[in-house]
Amino acid sequence: MQITELTIRNFRGIKDLTLEFDSTTVLIGENNSGKTTVLHALRACLSKLRSNGRAVVFDEYDFHLDENSKDPTQAEPIELILTFQETDKEWPAEIEQQLGGDGGIISFVGAEETARIRLKVIAKYSAVTGDVETEFNFLDANENPLANK
C-alpha cells in the first residue's frame, strides 16, 4: 500500500491542489512555490495515525488567505484528503474484512479491485472556542465520512 494522491484545499499558500504520487515522487520547484506546504500537509494527515490520537494542531497562519478572505477566523476550512491504495492485491481477505471490507474503511477500485483507503482532515475556526478545531475521518467509496472509525 502506498500514498497515491493528496488533495490540499485552503492550506497556507495553496488554494486547491491535487497531487498524484508514483512509487517514487520528487518535489521540485522554486523557493516559495509550496513544496514545504505539501510536506506539512502530509505530516498533518499522518500525525494522528502515528501518535496514538494526538494530532498536529493547526493555527490561524495555516489558513489560505487572499484578497477575498484576509481574516483567518472567516477563511474557508482547511481540507486535506490523503489516499492510500494497494499496488496489487497485497492484503489477505481476513484483513480486508477486519477493516470493514468494501463499504467500511476500505473501498475497492479498478478492474483488479485493489483496496483503497481515504483519510480526510478538516480544520476550521470555531467562534465558540476561539480555536481551530480539527476533524479526522475515513471516507467511504462515496466520499462520505465513516462514523467512529
Short names for language-model regions:
Residues P92-K149:
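A sensor for short, sequence-defined functional sites
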Residues M1-S51, A55-K70:
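Pre-Walker A-like glycine/lysine-rich segment at the N-terminus of P-loop NTPase domains
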Residues Q2, E76, T129-D131:
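A short, compositionally biased
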Residues D16, G29, E90-P92, D131:
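Short acidic, gly/pro-rich beta-turn/loop elements at beta-sheet edges
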Residues S23-T25, F84-D88, A123-A127:
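Beta-strand elements of well-folded, non-transmembrane domains
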Residues E5-T7, T18, E79-T83, R118-I122:
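Beta-strand secondary-structure signal
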Residues H40-E113:
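Conserved P-loop NTP-binding catalytic core
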